A protein has these predicted regions:
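Conserved nucleotide-sugar phosphate-binding/catalytic loop shared by glycosyltransferases and other
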Residues: 2, 20-59, 129, 140-143
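Histidine-centered beta-alpha loop that forms part of the nucleotide-sugar donor binding/catalytic region
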Residues: 3-4, 80, 101-104
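Short amphipathic alpha-helix
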Residues: 7-19, 30
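An amphipathic, basic-hydrophobic alpha-helix
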Residues: 51-73
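An aromatic- and histidine-rich active-site surface loop
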Residues: 72-93
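Active-site-proximal region of nucleotide-activated glycan assembly enzymes
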Residues: 95-144
Length: 144
């Protein structure tokens, strides 16, 4: 699950990992997401999310509904803000959480990364320098 655009593209690039697994997607209902995820099960979430209390409340309701319907064992996200309610509700429901910090933040954290870092089961970074910001992270290198 993640915002459309680059965040969703990062997740899609992990196709060798997820292609044979049961899955669903949560992202913005935008043309790029619909095109990329054609034929996939997709739930739309509310946007814009930029530091918006209204978006957080709406996406928390969506997260509650989707996660209670789907009951995932694992939630993976590359951000952005829409990940926060899904991760916290997912954690309460017993799902394992994997967060992949964005590629273009090398020496400082993202707001979403800061918010989900304490509850993730695996926090992945793409640069060794990011481990200074997230000491418990695992550096798997670039997704690209």
């Amino acid at each position: 699950m993640g915002s459309s655009g680059g965040h969703l593209t990062h997740l899609y690039m992990l196709k060798p990992f997820w292609k044979d697994k049961s899955r669903f997607w949560v992202t913005f209902d935008k043309e790029d997401a619909r095109s990329l995820l054609e034929g996939e099960k997709m739930y739309p979430c509310y946007y814009p999310t930029n530091r918006s209390l209204k978006a957080l409340i709406k996406n928390t309701k969506i997260a509650w509904s989707v996660l209670h319907k789907e009951k995932p064992d694992l939630i993976i996200s590359c951000g952005a803000a829409v990940a926060v309610p899904f991760f916290y509700i997912g954690k309460m429901m017993g799902a394992k959480l994997v967060y992949i910090e964005v590629f273009d933040r090398i020496d400082k954290s993202t707001i979403t990364g800061k918010m989900v870092y304490p509850i993730t089961d695996k926090f992945i970074v793409q640069w060794e320098e990011q481990k200074k910001v997230y000491p418990k992270a695992v550096n798997l290198g670039s997704i690209f």
